[in-house]
Amino acid sequence: MALLSAVKGKLISVIGDEDTCVGFLLGGIGEINKNRHPNFMVVDKNTAVSEIEDCFKRFIKRDDIDIILINQNYAEMIRHVIDAHTSPTPAVLEIPSKDHPYDASKDSILRRAKGMFNPDDMVANRG
């Protein structure tokens, strides 16, 4: 498991299928806090939607997590909970899975972020 840095860095958490979680765990994001709660959840075909929802709610309450990565197909299952999360941290990023490609039109957080910026302002600021 990854160690927290000397300056008490924040964690990335993952809610995803086995392949997604294993990939991120091999990358070193795995952590178990002092209460023995991991920062990841492996979702499979037998996982209830309520379990995904409960895990997401636990992750947004943890003060040691700054980013939540979630497979977009699981985010769709708990869309109402994700949309209710309006705090900037932890940031929620929807990612593709092996079997479900990313679809920007389904990403409510991306839509919200796009609404904050006017494309004309971006072009004007270049010059």
UniProtKB/Swiss-Prot annotation:
Q: Keywords of this protein's UniProt record, alphabetized?
A: Hydrogen ion transport, Ion transport, Transport
Q: Which InterPro entries match?
A: ATPase_V1-cplx_f_g_su, ATPase_V1-cplx_fsu_euk, ATPase_V1_fsu_sf
* Pfam families recorded: ATP-synt_F (PF01990)
Q: Does the keyword Transport apply?
A: yes
Disulfide bonds, which pairs?
A: none
| A GO term for molecular function | proton-transporting ATPase activity, rotational mechanism
User: What Gene Ontology cellular-component terms does the record carry?
Assistant: proton-transporting V-type ATPase, V1 domain
The keyword Coiled coil is annotated on this UniProt entry = no
Matching entries from Gene3D superfamilies are given as: ATPase, V1 complex, subunit F
Q: How does it assemble?
A: V-ATPase is a heteromultimeric enzyme made up of two complexes: the ATP-hydrolytic V1 complex and the proton translocation V0 complex. The V1 complex consists of three catalytic AB heterodimers that form a heterohexamer, three peripheral stalks each consisting of EG heterodimers, one central rotor including subunits D and F, and the regulatory subunits C and H. The proton translocation complex V0 consists of the proton transport subunit a, a ring of proteolipid subunits c9c'', rotary subunit d, subunits e and f, and the accessory subunits VhaAC45 and ATP6AP2.
Q: Which NCBIfam families match?
A: V_ATP_synt_F (TIGR01101)
Q: What does this protein do?
A: Subunit of the V1 complex of vacuolar(H+)-ATPase (V-ATPase), a multisubunit enzyme composed of a peripheral complex (V1) that hydrolyzes ATP and a membrane integral complex (V0) that translocates protons. V-ATPase is responsible for acidifying and maintaining the pH of intracellular compartments and in some cell types, is targeted to the plasma membrane, where it is responsible for acidifying the extracellular environment.
Q: Which family does it belong to?
A: Belongs to the V-ATPase F subunit family.
The name on file for this protein is V-type proton ATPase subunit F
